[in-house]
Amino acid sequence: IKELNIAYDKNFEFNKKELKSSKKLKFTNNQKDLKLANCFIISVPTPVDKLKKPDLRLLLKATQMIGKIIKKNDLIIFESTVYPGCTEEQCVPVLEKFSKLKYNKDFFCGYSPERINPGDKVHTISNVKKITSGSKPEVADIVDDIYKDIICVGTHKAPSIKVAEAAKIIENTQRDLNIAF
């Protein structure tokens, strides 16, 4: 966050000029600043543990932090790579617990898997279509509109959060198979 706020992207997806010219974008993990927002994007690493199971600790910790500050009608978009169903089965209950709000009544969720492959200069955030989804059709439209403003080559709206989560897993599997052969 500190690096991005001084317009430095260690993944080299964005140059200084692009980051400095983005007027609506703010990077922060300060809870006072976060309380002012109505849309949150959670994108944290989701490594696998020694047993090759997803380690969701960072994701759930970030979700808990956001759960403590969300308000009615807020939107939380997840980007971390997870298994199909994780957002609604693992993250939503944490948001409900810490916010005391009800999912799809008081707050809403979206999922749009990150598509950045650090170091890949061919398939960058600027030229890879972004998959989007939402917890309700009207929420999916909002999530899609947010990313349409950012992703030049466009978006693809998935019919559900679970389908968008599965698309990311399929993409990773295909990449791994291509590398293996």
Give the positions of each predicted feature.
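Structural/interface elements that position substrates and couple domains in central-metabolism enzymes
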Residues: I1-F181
